[in-house]
Structure formats: structure tokens, C-alpha cells
Design a protein with these regions (language model features):
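Noncatalytic carbohydrate-binding groove/subsite architecture in carbohydrate-active enzymes
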Residues: 223-345, 355
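Extracellular carbohydrate-recognition regions
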Residues: 51, 616-640
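Short S/T/G/P-enriched beta-strand
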Residues: 514-554, 605-618
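Extracellular ligand-binding interfaces
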Residues: 662-752
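Aromatic/acidic polysaccharide-binding cleft in carbohydrate-active enzymes
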Residues: 91, 323, 327-426
């Protein structure tokens, strides 16, 4: 296979006690969209909400951020049951102790490490008589990385303990040894007295992105080999501390790779099964489909329980199930920052509770991108400030407002409403999530044996959180609003559209507390959320917002209809707009290049913003000529990679020689370029890939429909299939191709490109 290639161009809010607002209770004459029937006397599941709302702390987290007092207080208010370290894929790349390897200052320069300590098998010789900051490896050769993180494991352990929560440790299977893991157990639990109970063996070793997935003989890690390694690690670690709990395989997704083999062959060394979940697909666009992806969790947990019953039936009540990493999706786009992240997470945690998941750790505390990121916080590194994102408040609501016993309930009616009902020593807790983006929902309660009681309704909606996709920050992020309501055996309440609601009903002998009204903008200031400069061929999402931008408060009182107008080469989707929770959206469709000014007016309030619409000119830039040494290409292949000068007249081409090998799962990569060269162009302007492909004239393929896929990778979207070429069309002759990126969300991700496959 030969390839000729060019690129085608183109401050934390603390919890405030809030608000007696207008009643959410409605007259009995209001229509009912859904009915919730509750039997508070029948418990159907038990769980510790704190254990289901754990999180992850990564070594690359910035020290000034984790030392930020507002950040620390927000986590204390959250009460996560555990915090997993040292951080995702780095778990397989990081030696926790650098004593004897680090010989200089604690920076990342190669001269500060004794490279003679690397053994022939790629492992490193560490002196465990003392502790020094650890070090990170890179690549299959296990060379030292040029970045080892801002934190070290001692900092992680002590920071977690200072917050009053527990650490969960993932040990290095990818490049470490059982002895390295056992030394961590000894140091943490015997020397330092950290008291770490949960230890996970390896991270996502089913994935070819993980160091350790590729074995020394060139084959790939599988479930049988992983389980053998697990047992070796477990023996060494239990020899140090027999009371610790060990688990794995921390598989990358709900396909549950390696889980069956571990339960079948791991025996009583397995104390818990850990899995990871990012179930919403990269190309899932509709909100309803994103929420539907949560159902995959139920199927996965049922499969795990089936394997436990099959292979270790005497331990069905003993082996725990944990989800040591989860978030809405892998790619860190706006879904990880907008309000949907909160609603999705609230339902996800509820389903984990229903299915009997024992513990879970959201991914993560501090990993972010400009467009969003998995972090539960918005992080401004310039000011070293943090602000909770919407997902934080979903975690907070489950951890602080919900009970530990789920009771019997049934919900009928409007499909967009989801419910979870728990009880505790203090009372009954009812969580209702309205996933409709357009409609409120009237929900009637029928509570068996209930009498009249004063309750508190906590509501989280766009009135509490709004993410500005153009400014890429929250315009406001506030705790759930609280209002007092009276509930009896048949009460109806209205749920705002796209909202989380928790109704706390104390037992009859208890009393609620009155609250002060929430802070709100006194006078509205209109603003337009728009980009500054955009291509003239893309529709523009826009918002009118009524708020106090300095105080980050929405204006929630009524405001006259907003009148919109435009000067310049574009049209508006509408001439007027009504605000809902201080926000209204519209669309601008460009009709050419030039300056565009949008005006918004409501009574005496007005604002204007200008946009530059940029004309599009396309040209191709050649990035690889393949006439230089292969080592300079920054390329690799599953197959033999070479340079050929005899296939194309007067040109060099890249060649992947199959040599009779058959592509198969995890071994089908023709060319992988990473990192991409940035010298000639700004990736933010790139909008496709162009090149030429040819297969040998005698190449045979049993599948006439076989295709070669072209995939771009970005820090904002790690897997973007942008096109494919039918294999039969390139056998024996060169075929040019040009594949353009057209989806707005993928164009937005181009600025952070790092790989081409």
C-alpha cells in the first residue's frame, strides 16, 4: 500500500441557601403530563450516594488549582466518596517513586534522570528506601517522557486525605512490575499510613493507545494474558497487605473487554470488577439519543452480574462492581460543558444506583479544553480561578440531597421525565429530571400513606447555569434554587424544561428552615453571545442574554420582547425573541463575506455586536514528501513501513508492506501520523485531507466492499472518521482523493488536531 499526502486548508460559587419563590404547586385543574406513584415503605435498592459520586485526580493537574481554597471547598461541599489516582492512561506510564532515577532538580529535563537505571526488559530500577517524585515513560521503548506532571503521588495522597475522602489507586501494569505495585502498597499503607483500601490493577489495557497493550512479541494484550498479570500483581500486593481490595480490568468501555476472563480465571484474587464508560457516540447529535445511551449501562451491569454468578457463584454478594471512570462521552466538546452534562449525569447516577453499582468515579476534576472538557470545573489558568460546571451540581445534588435507600416507585406519562426516589433518616427525596428542551412538565404525586407536609424543592435549570459557547465559559453557575412547597397525597408540581429537580420531604416530626431569597440581577443588561470572526459559509448560533455580567447573575424577571435587526450580508432566523430564564437563541445565515452588525433592543435596553465574515479560499499544502528519513515522518504502521522511489516517477512515496499479513482488530493501521507538522499552516483553518493512494496490482481481498478509512484525531474530538476509499478502486493504479470536513463541531475541533490515520 502506498500513500502520497497533502493537507487541505481552509471563581467557584459556594453553596448558598436560597429562596422562597413563587410556588411550584399548581391547582388541581392543571393538566397532568406524568404521574409518579411512590411506596415509601418498600426499599428496592441500597447504596451510598457519596460512593457513587467519586472522581479522579490526575498528575497533570496544576498545583495552583488544587491549592485554590475555593476549589477545595467546592469538593468538600460535594463529598465525593473516593478520588482515583494517579490519572487515566498515565497509570500505565508512571513509576510512582523516582528515588535513584531522579538525580537532579524536580523538573522535566532529561539530564535530571539516570538513564542507566533502565533494565533490558524496559523496566526501571528504583531505590525504595526513600521517596522522590515519580517519573513518566513514553512509547513502547519505555523512554523517559519530557513531562512528568505538575503533581506527584505523595501530593495526591495528602491532598485527598486533607479533604476527608479516600484515595483509590491504579497501579502500573503497562510498564511496571508486581514489585513496583507492592512497594506502593507498602509505602502508602505501612510507611505513610494513608490507609488506601481500593487498588486497581492496570488501566484500559484492552486499548491500543495504552502503554502495555502491545506485548514484546508484537501481539496484543488479551483477557487471558491480562488475567495472568492480574494474579501476579495481586499475589505481590496481598503479600504486603492482605486486607486491601483488588480489582480490574478498568476496560475502556461498556463492551466489557477482559471482564469475563478476569472473573473466570482470576479466582478469589478479584475483589471488584471495574469498568469505564463514555457511552454517547461522537456523532450523536439529538439530545434524546444522548440520554438513551445511558440504557447501555443496564445491559453491561447485567452481563457482569451474569459472569459473577456463572464463574464465582459463592461470591455474588462479595464481588463489587465499580465504574472507575465515566463521563457523557470521550470527546471533550460542548456537551461536556453545557447544561445537558448535568441532566445526563443525574440520570446516569440514578441508573447506577438502581442497578446496584457499588462505587463510581467521574472523570475528572481538572482536565479541560477550550470548548469544554471532562473537568467538573471551568478553570481559568490565567487567573488561577475555578467555577463549577453543570456536571458538578448534578454530583452535588446526588451526594447532598438524596438518600441511601431507593424505594419502590413508578412513573407514567411524559417520556421526557425521569425519576428516582430515595429515603433516609431525615425523610423522602424525589428527583425528577425533565429532559425536554422545549416543554415544561406537570407531574402529579401519589404517595402511599402521605399526609400534608412542608417540603423543599431544589431546581437546577438554565436559570442556574448557562455556558457561552463563544466565550467558552459559564456566564453564570449557581447552586440549585430552593423553594418551600406544601405536599399532600396528591400534589402536582411543574418542572421547568431541561431541568433537575429534587423534592425533599421530611418525616412529619421534622420542620423545614426558611431561606433568604437568591441574589439576582436588579437591572438587566442586554448582551449578544457571538463569535468575533467566522467563515462566511457557516450558519452562526447566537444568543441574546439579559444579565449582570459583572456579578455573573441572570435577570430572571419578565422583560419585553427582544427586537432583532441586522446590518450586512446575512439574514436572521427571526425578527423578535422571547427570553426564557434570561436567554434566547437565534441563528444567523451569512450571504457573503464582510462586516456584520446585529442589534438587539427591548424597551430602553439595547446592545449591538459586530462579526467579521471571512471569505473562504482553499488551497492544498504538502506536508509529507517522504523523501526524508522515515524517522522524520512521525509515522507508524501495523505493517512494515518503508519509503519507495520506484512506484511513482521521480517521487518518493510511503509504503505499508502487508507481507501476507491479514488486517484484524487492533492490527489494521496502514499509516498513523502523529504529531502532525504545524510549520506550514494553522490547523484552525484546515478543513480536510487530500492525497493519492495506490494498492499493489496483485493485492487480493476477500471482501469486495472493503474500504480504507481516513480518520482525524483532535484533543477536542479524538476520533473523527471523515471519509473512506473503496479498496478495489485503487488496486494497480493511483487514485487522488480529497475529503472535506463539513460538520461544524468537527471544524471546531480542527484547531487541536494531533493525529491522522
Amino acid at each position: 500500500m502506498a500513500f502520497n499526502f497533502t493537507l487541505y486548508i481552509k471563581s467557584t460559587s459556594t453553596l448558598a441557601v436560597i429562596a422562597l419563590l413563587q410556588s411550584a404547586c399548581h391547582a388541581e385543574t392543571n393538566s397532568v403530563d406524568a404521574t409518579l406513584r411512590i411506596d415509601a415503605d418498600t426499599v428496592v435498592q441500597t447504596a451510598d450516594p457519596h460512593r457513587l459520586t467519586g472522581t479522579n485526580l490526575s498528575l497533570w493537574s496544576r498545583l495552583p488549582i488544587i491549592e485554590n481554597v475555593n476549589f477545595q471547598q467546592a469538593i468538600r461541599d460535594w463529598h465525593p466518596g473516593s478520588i482515583r489516582i494517579p490519572g487515566g492512561s498515565w497509570s500505565n506510564e508512571y513509576y510512582w517513586n523516582g528515588n535513584g532515577v531522579r538525580i537532579g532538580d524536580n523538573d522535566h529535563s532529561i539530564e535530571n534522570f539516570d538513564q542507566s537505571k533502565q533494565q533490558a526488559d524496559g523496566s526501571w530500577e528504583v531505590d525504595y528506601s526513600e521517596y522522590k517524585k515519580g517519573f513518566r515513560l513514553h512509547g513502547e521503548e519505555r523512554h523517559l517522557s519530557n513531562y512528568h506532571g505538575d503533581l506527584d503521588v505523595k501530593t495526591q495522597h495528602e491532598w485527598i486525605n486533607s479533604l476527608g475522602t479516600e484515595a483509590m489507586v491504579t497501579v502500573n501494569v503497562g510498564s511496571g512490575t508486581p514489585a513496583v505495585a507492592a512497594e506502593w502498597v507498602k509505602w502508602a499503607n505501612q510507611t505513610q499510613r494513608y490507609g488506601v483500601r481500593y487498588w486497581e490493577i492496570g488501566n484500559e489495557l484492552n486499548g491500543d493507545w495504552e502503554l502495555g497493550h502491545r506485548l514484546p512479541d508484537g501481539s496484543s494484550m488479551d483477557g487471558t494474558i491480562y488475567t495472568q498479570r492480574f494474579v501476579e500483581f495481586a499475589k505481590a500486593m496481598h503479600a504486603i497487605d492482605p486486607d486491601i481490595l483488588l480489582g480490574g480490568p478498568a476496560c475502556s468501555d461498556l463492551a466489557l473487554s477482559f471482564v469475563e476472563e478476569l472473573l473466570r480465571d482470576g479466582g478469589d484474587a478479584v475483589d471488584f470488577v471495574s469498568i469505564h464508560a463514555y457511552p454517547v457516540g461522537v456523532n450523536t447529535r439529538q439530545s434524546a439519543d444522548k440520554f438513551a445511551a445511558i440504557l447501555e449501562l443496564r445491559k453491561a451491569i447485567h452481563r457482569v452480574r451474569g459472569w459473577i454468578s456463572k464463574y464465582q457463584p459463592e461470591r455474588t454478594d462479595e464481588i463489587e462492581i465499580g465504574i472507575s471512570e465515566w463521563n457523557i462521552k470521550v470527546n471533550e466538546d460542548r456537551d461536556t460543558a453545557e447544561l445537558i452534562s448535568a441532566l445526563w449525569s443525574a440520570i446516569w447516577i440514578g441508573v447506577m444506583f438502581e442497578e446496584g453499582v457499588d462505587f463510581a468515579n467521574q472523570w475528572d476534576l481538572t482536565t479541560y479544553t477550550e470548548g469544554g472538557g471532562h473537568s467538573a470545573f471551568y478553570i481559568d489558568e490565567g487567573n488561577m480561578s475555578v467555577l463549577p460546571k453543570s456536571q458538578y451540581w448534578a454530583l452535588w445534588m446526588w451526594s447532598n440531597l438524596m438518600g441511601h435507600e431507593m424505594v419502590k416507585s413508578s412513573l407514567s406519562g411524559m417520556e421526557s421525565v425521569k425519576s428516582f426516589v430515595t429515603r433516609s433518616d431525615t425523610g423522602l427525596q424525589i428527583m425528577l429530571i425533565n429532559t425536554s428542551e422545549s416543554d415544561e412538565a406537570n407531574v402529579a404525586f401519589q404517595i402511599k400513606g402521605a399526609s400534608r407536609v412542608e417540603g423543599q424543592l431544589h431546581t437546577y435549570s438554565s436559570a442556574e447555569y448557562f455556558w457561552d459557547v463563544h466565550a467558552r465559559e459559564p456566564l453564570w453557575s449557581r447552586p440549585p434554587t430552593v423553594q418551600q412547597i406544601t405536599v399532600n397525597h396528591s400534589t402536582t408540581i411543574t418542572l421547568p424544561k431541561f431541568s433537575i429537580n429534587v423534592l425533599e420531604l421530611p418525616w412529619a416530626s421534622q420542620h423545614t428552615t426558611q431561606h433568604t431569597p437568591p441574589a439576582a440581577a436588579v437591572q438587566p443588561s442586554l448582551q449578544l453571545s457571538l463569535p468575533h470572526r467566522v467563515p462566511a459559509d457557516r450558519a452562526i448560533e447566537a444568543w441574546v442574554i439579559a444579565s449582570d455580567p459583572e456579578a455573573q447573575l441572570p435577570y430572571l424577571q419578565s422583560i419585553d420582547t427582544i427586537q432583532l435587526s441586522i446590518d450586512g450580508p446575512a439574514i436572521l432566523s427571526q425578527a423578535s425573541i422571547e427570553l426564557d430564564n434570561a436567554v434566547g437563541s437565534f441563528t444567523i445565515t451569512p450571504k457573503g463575506a464582510g462586516k456584520l452588525t446585529i442589534h438587539a433592543r427591548s424597551g430602553k435596553h439595547s446592545t449591538s455586536r459586530s462579526i467579521e465574515l471571512v471569505a473562504i479560499e482553499e488551497r492544498a499544502y504538502t506536508n509529507w514528501t517522504f523523501d526524508n528519513p522515515i524517522s522524520d515522518w512521525q509515522a507508524k504502521s501495523t505493517f512494515e513501513l518503508g519509503s519507495e522511489s520506484s512506484i511513482k516517477p521521480n517521487q518518493y512515496v510511503a509504503a505499508a508492506r502487508l507481507n501476507g499479513e491479514t488486517p484484524k482488530r487492533d492490527a489494521d493501521l496502514l499509516f498513523h501520523f502523529e504529531p502532525l507538522p504545524r510549520e506550514k499552516l494553522s490547523f484552525a483553518n484546515a478543513n480536510g485531507v487530500t492525497g493519492q493512494l495506490r494498492a499493489a496490482h496483485n493485492l487480493q481481498c476477500a471482501d469486495p466492499k472493503a474500504r480504507i478509512n481516513i480518520i482525524l484525531q483532535s484533543d477536542a474530538n479524538h476520533w473523527m472518521p471523515i471519509g473512506s476509499i473503496k479498496l478495489s478502486n485503487i488496486i494497480g493504479e493511483w487514485k487522488p482523493f480529497a475529503v472535506k470536513v463539513t460538520k461544524p463541531e468537527e471544524l471546531d475541533a480542527m484547531a487541536k488536531l494531533y493525529g491522522l490515520r
